[in-house]
Amino acid sequence: MSEQKEDLFKPVGEAAAEVEDESIAEQNKANDGVKLTGAQDAMGHPVQEIESLCMNCGKNGTTRLLLTSIPYFREIIIMSFDCPHCGFKNCEIQPASQIQEKGSRYVLKVECREDFNRQVIKSETATCKFVELDIEIPAKRGQLTTVEGLLSEMIDDLSQDQEMRKSIDEALYKKIDDFIQKVKSYINCEPNTIPITFILDDPAGNSWIEYKPGEPQHKWSHTQYVRTDEQNVQVGIITRDQLEQRRQEQLKQLANRERNPSESVKVGSANPQFLSDATDIENFNNEVQTFRASCPSCTQECETHMKPVNIPHFKEVIIMSTVCDHCGYKSNEVKTGGAIPDKGRRITLYCDDAADLSRDILKSETCSMVIPELHLDIQEGTLGGRFTTLEGLLRQVYEELESRIFTQTSDSMDEATKARWVEFFAKLKEAIAGKVKFTVIMEDPLAGSYIQNVYAPDPDPNMTIEDYERTKEQNEDLGLSDIKVE
């Protein structure tokens, strides 16, 4: 009789696998229909599975969800649906983060074949435009793709029914085929096709075009803007009924003010320190004035504080601060007033001493700033209006870029791009510490920006100020073209 050897101890790998399987099974029971597949991405985020309705055949299919992070963007949800009954498949992305405080507008100049390979995050509220091709892609499902991918998908959609069109309407078939060939010629960068302008506009602020450090100013730009009421409805912050209700309330308040102007300060609030309060107007320059406005994030009514500040050897500006008690939104901006000057202004400062970092600096919304030695290019509309020091402005740029663009834990950049970012941040840190010399060039078409002259009223040997004629494009962007004053 042979004895059968009994395994008293299981291998560590088998025991760990059983524990993991049991853990996944217990979590699947507790998740009420959401199952863990056991798969993970590179950062350890689990892939989840849920049974969902197929909109093609009406039976149940499987949706897989992965919450992950784009290294220099933000969190997203990648969704993949598969129906075993009819074979229907679909992939899309959804932003996992909240709707941003402001909308975003990206502009990319596609000048070579590599630019077509840039990653693009297109949320469900974003629209895309290819200006030279006269193409606009409306808001639809979210996508993680490339510039070429957007055009290729459009070509695939147009090509689907071409054979049918050829037999029904040959003229229409020929027009669509010519257009498809034209788009393909742009993708292949054939002669006389590039550059091409690609615009990505997202009122929710959750879209993005890949940026590469060290690019010239005209190549890539990102501006933020305050959403309109219609855009707030589009992104789902408020409903159409709520918008109409608020408009009716505003019309009622306006009618009450017209009927009884002396009671206008009482409409909407009991706060006596509004800008319209006659007792406070006398001390307008000495006290902080408060008025009610709509929050750009949640559209609820909130208070905005403002105070005029006179900058020596420049002009008076208005510092504005908004705080919303409903959603917690906060913003601080500087507005320059007065008449629009005939010319723009370019200020160039050579910083050769650490003391230059303590100079006051006013950067208006229309001002662009370039530091060639650091390969830093700040576009118009970026950072908004700021009244701070040169060190404070550079530190803000460093903190925002580091938190958004470069992370050590979730980095999918290629080695060349990563090396450029590391070099860029190293130079920027040295500049903030006053260890390197650099040149600041501020260009404002409205001449509303300023750098402190520490030698005032005498000229500053390290600073030059020159006025220049605005271009036709700048006048057009600022709304100064074809103005009728009569």
UniProtKB/Swiss-Prot annotation:
Signal sequence segment: none
Principal place of residence: cytoplasm
Chain positions found as Phosphoserine: S23
The keyword Repeat is annotated on this UniProt entry: yes
Keywords in alphabetical order: Chaperone, Cytoplasm, Metal-binding, Nucleus, Phosphoprotein, Repeat, Zinc, Zinc-finger
Subunit structure: Interacts with elongation factor 1-alpha.
Name used for this protein in its record: Zinc finger chaperone ZPR1
The encoding gene: ZPR1
